[in-house]
Amino acid sequence: MRQTATALDDVVVVGYGTQKKINLTGAVQSINSKDILRANVSNGSSALQGIVPGLTAVQSSGQPGNDQASLKLRGLGSLNSSTSPLILIDGVEGDFNRIDLNSIETISVLKDAASASIYGSRASNGVILITTKRGYEGKPTVTFNGYVGMNTPTTLPEPATAIEYMQAVDIARQNALQQPLYTNVIDIYKNGGVDQINYYDTDWRNEVIKSSALVQNYSVSVSGGSEFIKVFASAGYYSQDGLIDNNKFSRTSLRLNSDMKINKWVKLGIDASVRQANATSPVMDSPANIIGKALTMTPIMSGINADGTYGYGINGTNPIAMVRTGCTSNSTAPEYIIKTSLTITPLKGLSIYGAYTWKRNDGETNAFVKPYDTYENGAFKGSFPTTGSSMSDQRTKQVRKQYDLIGTYENTFGKNYLKVLMGFQSEELNYTYLVAGRKNYYYDGYQDLNNGDAATMTNSSARHAWAMLSYLFRVNYSFDDRYLFEVNGRYDGTSRFIGNNRWGFFPSVSAGWRISEEAFWESAKNVMDNFKLRASYGLLGNQAISSYYPYSASIGSSTGYGYWFDKEFSPGVAQTQLANPDITWEKSHQFDIGVDYAFLKNRLSGSFDYYVRNIDDMLQQFPVPLFVAMTSPWENAGSMRNNGWEFSIAWQDRIGNVDYYIKGNISDVKNKVINLYGKEYKSGTTLTTEGKPYGSWYGYVADGYFSSREEIDASPVYGGNKANVAPGDIKYKDISGPDGVPDGKIDSHDRTIIGNPTPRYEFGLTLGLQWKGIDFSAFFQGVGKKDVYYSGAGARALCGNYTIYKYQFDYWTPENPDAKFPRLLEDPNATNPNNMISSFWVKSGAYCRLKNIVLGYTLPSSITKAAHISKLRVYASAQNLFTIKDNFYEGFDPENSVSSGASLYPLNKTFVFGLNVEF
């Protein structure tokens, strides 16, 4: 890892072109292919987690092919529109999780208005540019990269055994002044009475969730060419088995990127890629809900009978049967992309680039349901689901066409450097959807749509289209490589708005000062190689709301709108949503000031940024009078602010034969809703209101436990009936009343903001070294501050039909007054006052995770040359190896925490062995 003075001369991919890193005036983060592949992950969202300061990447699920990853750049960008960055793969919008990571050359993250405004109305939430690999002039190189390994859950809660569960229920009943229910049954269990016919001890977790699942990934590529033609071709295959039966995902990818030199001033590019994803999952419920059932159902319920038949579970709901009966949803999603480009350089410094891209995404999902039979106590209990057998067939098609025409002029005049870019882009998208279904399939093996009962047939379809037309420009000027100036602008027109609101102009301006190039800095050059100040301001837009025609009235058809004509009923249509032709773009005014630095011959380098994002004209829907009987229209009304900072630092050096590096970053963002025009967004657990962060946790403020009857008699209690409250129950604070002052009651007036779910102080730390062919790296990622509200089984024992977990036995008793949980109570209807939404159930979601660790060995070339191999590396890697948590619930993961408790697909702890070979 030898350092050179050219480190800062690296070229960075920016919008519609490239720039030298030293000349950047915007906030741009670049990631190379080595950093991407080091983690050995299957999708791009996970590859960026913890690497890019300011980028929040949250993986909410470990489900194969559906990790529900969310990306947010510099905080939340909208209330009702898209909040994800614009992701462009070779200039065309795409899905980060659908691309083979082995084919990626670089990723550039455009964070501020200066770098992103050239993408105008779709860049409000930032832009991620993905550039795939291309061929080079020289002897062809064949590269193979593959690994195989196992996934296991990062963590799972441990449910109680049947005896422990029944003992807990009896204690809860005694606390409620009720007679114990299981005294005699417990004795039967203790004396070996469990026979899985009349008495059950079902380990739902181990019956449904597998201890490990296979994961494998293989990629082979060829790159090379001559002066006149260069080619990069790759093929990839990825497969992941799920942690439950009948759950699997696979992806096959093919790519061909070619560049042809027609003559000295004309170049032709032809790129083609094909990808197909296949997914299988149980059809009777989502995999996450099935796992949730397995983690919450009580052990005394029948799961598997002694003769192998399925138990009755909860009124026929049996997650074991759901995953094992073979009733699955099978989906296929092919993607085809063809891109042709022509580059003309008629004059020195002048380049004209034109491209046409055609992209098609298809989807086909077939789901078949066959009821399973259940038995309990030796008797048949029924078939479930009770609706009988059914089948559905769903088809989607999406076609995107994009035209680009970009002209670039670049020249140097003495100490003056000028680069001007102007362009045009047209894009259109067409989408169709069709689904059909039937019920009552009486014979196995005839799972075709037309074999169902025609009298039960259903069908539905949808269609929408969208188009944009854009004009764009950028001007870069620098003097003596010291004073940098850049102006960007884009003029967008979209089909989502009409009239004068259809078009919007989104400009930005930025400047940089390389102080280290000044004469007065010369004495400090030996210590500080580069020091650059930069600042930017600009306007970005957002038009990506859920509706493709938000300005128009909506028309719906229904028998309820019909009318009788000559004793015959005819269905009708009616307006269902009010129109508003005056709506327009959401706007984001962004300011950024930053510094880039490099010390000690570029061994120590990094950057710092402070930014403010003011989001205005947010799209909302306000209530209309009930007699209107229609959905309210969209309106531009509301504003929000994000402000934060980002810091990154890296040290890389060599000691003897050891090359080593340390890279770290940390960032923070604060969100504040400025103006909602008097509206509040209030759900059961969250509140969005003016002056507070979006989606703040909202509930009562807990004040410990009641310790005595005297304390209860002297305090206000929830509901007002003190006879329903006992020592060991949660005590709530009386903080307000109808007049805004405490009134001696605990009611809805005492609800307030009790936590902030926005992650704060996100960080990443990478350590690595190389020594005589051995390479090692470890990557830590985490969140310094986040509030998580939990309900359901994850927090509340015996709530609803839930079981109790081992860690929940730390409940209040007179002998255990500092317990983690209040006194035990059954709560079949979820009305227990202890289970109110309160700060008691808000826990710290802060964590630090060893996200990835890799140990590899590259064989000496003296050995591999004999086999005509230029490089051979073997490695072992582990992901999510351990997590340090801040008093979080045992068995639950703070990264994919959800407020509903246990209905989630656990994240994966992965162990793989891999091989890299180059010929």
Language model segments and positions:
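Short, small/polar-rich motifs associated with maturation and membrane association
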Residues: M1-R255, M260-N263, K267-D271, R275, ...
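A structural detector for beta-sheet-dominated domains
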Residues: R2-T4, V58, R74, G638, ...
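Extracellular/periplasmic, surface-exposed regions of secreted and cell-surface proteins
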Residues: D10, I36, S84, R251, ...
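Extracytoplasmic assembly/pore-lining segments of large envelope/extracellular complexes
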Residues: R98-I99, K359, T374
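Surface-exposed, extracytoplasmic segments of Gram-negative outer-membrane nutrient-acquisition systems
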Residues: P180, I188, D195, V369, ...
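Structured loop/turn residues at beta-strand edges in well-structured enzyme cores
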Residues: T6, G26, G50, N97-E105, ...
